[in-house]
C-alpha cells in the first residue's frame, strides 16, 4: 500500500470519531416529537366540548407521556353546580400515552394528533415549562369555560415556549 494512502487513511480514521462525537444527542433531539391531542366530545357535562392535551414522545429514552390539564376530583362537593358557575379547580396531570388513549378508546371517543413543528430549543423550552407547571405548587388552576381550560393552557404554554426561544406563534390561512 502506498505510504501517502496509508497516511490519508490514518488521518481519516483518526478524525472520524471526532466527527461523529455528539451525534447521539442530535439524533435524540431529532427524535423528540411534541403534539397537540384533540379529543372528541363526550356525553358528560365536563366532556361536552371535547378535550386537548400535549403529547411528548422521546423514543430513545422510552418517554411517551401526556400533559393533561383536564383533571379534577369527582369528590368535589356540588361538582356540577361549581362547574356550571366556573368555580371548579382543575389540575395538570401527567400520564402514559397508552393509558390516556385507552380511556378515550373505551368511551368510543376519537383522538387526533397534530405534531408541532418546533425547533430543538422550542421543544426544550416547552418541556421545561410543562415540568415546572407540573410541580405540586403549580398544577392546580381555577377552570374557566372561555379563558382558562384544557384548550387554552396548552396553547399558552406553546406560545410561552416560543417567546422564550425568541420565536412567535404563527397561523396560516392556507387550506
Model-inferred region functions:
Residues 1-25:
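Bacterial Sec-dependent N-terminal signal peptides
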Residues 22, 58-59, 131, 159:
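Residue-level marker of positions within ordered structural domains that often coincide
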Residues 25, 97-98, 125-127:
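Short, flexible segments with low predicted structural confidence
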Residues 29-109:
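Glycine-rich catalytic cores of cysteine/serine-nucleophile enzymes that process amide/ester linkages
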Residues 42-43, 109-117, 136-145:
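Second-shell loop/turn segments in exported
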Residues 119-131:
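A structural motif
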Residues 132-175:
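Activation targets extended, charge/polar-rich intrinsically disordered C-terminal tails
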Amino acid at each position: 500500500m502506498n505510504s501517502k494512502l496509508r497516511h490519508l487513511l490514518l488521518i481519516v480514521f483518526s478524525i472520524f470519531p471526532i466527527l461523529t462525537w455528539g451525534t447521539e444527542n442530535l439524533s435524540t433531539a431529532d427524535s423528540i416529537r411534541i403534539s397537540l391531542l384533540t379529543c372528541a366530545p363526550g356525553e358528560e357535562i365536563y366532556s361536552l366540548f371535547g378535550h386537548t392535551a400535549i403529547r411528548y414522545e422521546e423514543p430513545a429514552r422510552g418517554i411517551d407521556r401526556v400533559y393533561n390539564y383536564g383533571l379534577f376530583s369527582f369528590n368535589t362537593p356540588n361538582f356540577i353546580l361549581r362547574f356550571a358557575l366556573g368555580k371548579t379547580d382543575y389540575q395538570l396531570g401527567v400520564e402514559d400515552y397508552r393509558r390516556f388513549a385507552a380511556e378515550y378508546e373505551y368511551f368510543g371517543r376519537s383522538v387526533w394528533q397534530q405534531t408541532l413543528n418546533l425547533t430543538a430549543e422550542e421543544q426544550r423550552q416547552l418541556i421545561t415549562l410543562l415540568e415546572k407547571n407540573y410541580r405540586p405548587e403549580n398544577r392546580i388552576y381555577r377552570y374557566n369555560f372561555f379563558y382558562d381550560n384544557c384548550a387554552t393552557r396548552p396553547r399558552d404554554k406553546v406560545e410561552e415556549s416560543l417567546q422564550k426561544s425568541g420565536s412567535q406563534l404563527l397561523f396560516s390561512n392556507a387550506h
